[in-house]
Regions:
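A short beta-strand submotif of the Rossmann-like class I SAM-dependent methyltransferase core
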Residues: 80-83
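Conserved beta-strand signature within the Rossmann-like core of class I S-adenosyl-L-methionine
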Residues: 106-114
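A short glycine-rich, Lys/Arg-flanked "PGG" loop and its adjoining helix->strand segment in the class I
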Residues: 93-105
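A short acidic, Gly/Pro-enriched loop at the edge of an enzyme's catalytic core
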Residues: 70-78
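C-terminal alpha-helical "lid/dimerization" subdomain adjacent to the S-adenosyl-L-methionine
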Residues: 114-168
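Class I SAM-dependent methyltransferase SAM/SAH-binding core
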Residues: 12-14, 20-69
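Conserved alpha-helix/loop element of class I SAM-dependent methyltransferases that forms part
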Residues: 1-10
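Core SAM-dependent methyltransferase catalytic element
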Residues: 170-192
């Protein structure tokens, strides 16, 4: 929906962190005229994406690699879901700049990933809330606790205000929060 506000019926959309293809499938089904490029560093995930997409592959090109491997085309939009939280601030800024470089002026970028306050108490509180939500959804308490410990130790999480600042530094404006669910946040921003 956020991309469709500005992407033409025959638009080109870059999906960074394409994973198993669920996002690509949703786009291809909702917007059959779009040409989609899915980029992901994991060949097994791209193989799964191909299976997930089935006959919709006629609208999709898959590329194994990172943003630097994506063609230097001007896309009408891009998305990057559940990916940026794996990158430290420097890598994240580089990735956002490279996404920006591949977008038409005014093109939307949708990102969503873990983002929590960086003060120790705030970070702990939001991760505990995420674990509690998991438990309420049927995840075993021990598994939920292990998950948030792994997130805290392994992911270079940034605060929401840092995320907005990086988007702006990379050349995006009109940054808007469109989703907040415990530790997950989503923003839409537009290439200048």
């Amino acid at each position: 929906m956020l991309l469709a506000e500005r992407v033409p019926a025959q638009g080109r959309v870059l999906v960074l962190g394409a994973g198993g293809g669920l996002e690509l499938k949703a786009f291809a089904e909702a917007q059959p005229g779009w040409q989609l490029l899915g980029v992901d560093p994991a060949a097994p995930m791209l193989a799964l994406a191909e299976q997930t997409l089935g006959p919709l592959m006629s609208h999709v090109q898959l590329l194994e690699g990172y943003i630097d491997d994506a063609p230097d085309l001007r896309f009408d939009a891009a998305s990057c879901l559940l990916t940026l939280h794996f990158l430290d601030a420097g890598q994240r800024l580089h990735t956002l700049r490279e996404l920006h470089r591949r977008l038409q002026p005014g093109a939307p970028l949708v990102v969503a990933h873990h983002s929590v306050p960086q003060d120790p108490a705030g970070k702990r509180r939001w991760l505990q809330r995420y674990a509690a939500f998991g438990e309420a959804s049927g995840v075993a308490r021990a598994d939920a606790q292990r998950a948030i410990e792994a997130i805290a130790e392994r992911l270079p999480l940034l605060a929401p205000e840092q995320e907005v600042a990086l988007l702006q530094e990379a050349g995006f404006d009109d940054v808007e929060l469109f989703y907040a669910g415990f530790s997950f946040k989503g923003w839409v921003a537009y290439a200048k």
